[in-house]
């Protein structure tokens, strides 16, 4: 039976470090990490995500502000707000909650955020830094950053000699995951929906990362015995056994089968998910440390 990688516990550890290092930063420099969260419209899921991020920021001792714009807000209004936040010295991290209404160009909005305050890690400059191995000076997207901490807890920071397979090529998870694994000296293969003989490729992995958004796509016989399996997927599927109309969350991996084969595995829920918000807090603290000219903490 595989070792369970407890994302909730790891996330608590990261947040605990953020709290401690924030107190040290404030005591030494007087700088309080500041994060601004911007939401456009009233999408219920987005409201829940934003509330949890704001709550966690306050728990960490951050200066946290939330800007709520109506669904009808123009793109220019949003861009003007971002520019004002770019110029606000009390704000070190800016997060625009996605998705945005259809009349707003998300790409343009993201590229308007100052790269130094882009704690989501989506600006072209941060993407480029990560792609050229400048991991220390980049902001890394929060989900793959959290997944890497999970991998490091099992294998250490140097992945030399290990084969990693990332299933999924999204800009948010798949591509940055590839770059992080490569920077840690793993031999990395990126696979996707058009990859030939995907199960055979997955079976070569000492570290298998699933990030495709397909419920339970990765079967137990895709997993190399003893491999570390990181399941990034969060999918809601019908659960008639719980009653009519009920649902449950599953990952991209068939957990029940994969757990029998893997050496270590993340559950869904309670795996990578909690790490995402924790790493957002870590990135915000890092931004404040860079502003203060002090060394950023290691997570």
UniProtKB/Swiss-Prot annotation:
Family: Belongs to the tetrahydrofolate dehydrogenase/cyclohydrolase family.
PANTHER family in the cross-refs: C-1-TETRAHYDROFOLATE SYNTHASE, CYTOPLASMIC (PTHR48099:SF5), C-1-TETRAHYDROFOLATE SYNTHASE, CYTOPLASMIC-RELATED (PTHR48099)
EC number: 1.5.1.5, 3.5.4.9
Natural source organism: Brucella anthropi (strain ATCC 49188 / DSM 6882 / CCUG 24695 / JCM 21032 / LMG 3331 / NBRC 15819 / NCTC 12168 / Alc 37)
Coiled coil region boundaries: none
GO aspect biological process, one term: purine nucleotide biosynthetic process
Catalyzed reaction equations: (6R)-5,10-methylene-5,6,7,8-tetrahydrofolate + NADP(+) = (6R)-5,10-methenyltetrahydrofolate + NADPH; (6R)-5,10-methenyltetrahydrofolate + H2O = (6R)-10-formyltetrahydrofolate + H(+)
Protein name: Bifunctional protein FolD
């Amino acid at each position: 039976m595989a070792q369970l990688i407890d994302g909730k516990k790891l996330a608590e550890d990261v947040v605990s470090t953020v709290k401690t290092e924030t107190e040290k930063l404030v005591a030494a420099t007087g700088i309080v990490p500041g994060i601004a969260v911007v939401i456009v419209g009233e999408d219920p899921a987005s409201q829940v995500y934003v509330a949890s991020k704001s709550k966690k920021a306050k728990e960490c001792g951050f200066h946290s502000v939330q800007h709520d714009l109506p669904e009808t807000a123009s793109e220019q209004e949003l861009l003007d707000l971002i520019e004002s936040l770019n110029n606000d010295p009390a704000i070190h991290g800016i997060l625009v909650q996605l998705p945005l209404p259809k009349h707003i160009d998300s790409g343009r909005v993201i590229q308007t955020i100052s790269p130094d305050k882009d704690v989501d890690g989506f600006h072209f400059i941060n993407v480029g830094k990560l792609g050229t191995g400048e991991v220390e000076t980049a902001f890394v997207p929060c989900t793959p950053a959290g997944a890497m901490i999970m991998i490091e807890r099992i294998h250490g920071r140097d992945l030399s000699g290990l084969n990693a397979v990332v299933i999924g090529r999204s800009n948010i998870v798949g591509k940055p995951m590839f770059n992080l694994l490569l920077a840690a000296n793993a031999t990395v293969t990126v696979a996707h929906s058009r990859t030939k003989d995907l199960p055979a490729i997955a079976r070569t992995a000492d570290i298998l990362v699933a990030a495709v958004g397909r419920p339970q796509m990765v079967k137990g016989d895709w997993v190399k015995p003893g491999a570390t399996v990181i399941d990034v997927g969060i999918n809601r599927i019908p659960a008639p056994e719980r009653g009519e109309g009920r649902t449950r969350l599953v990952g991209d991996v068939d957990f029940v089968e994969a757990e029998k084969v893997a050496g270590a595995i993340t559950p869904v829920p309670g795996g990578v998910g909690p790490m995402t918000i924790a790493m957002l807090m870590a990135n915000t603290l890092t931004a404040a440390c860079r502003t203060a000219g002090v060394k950023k903490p290691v997570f």
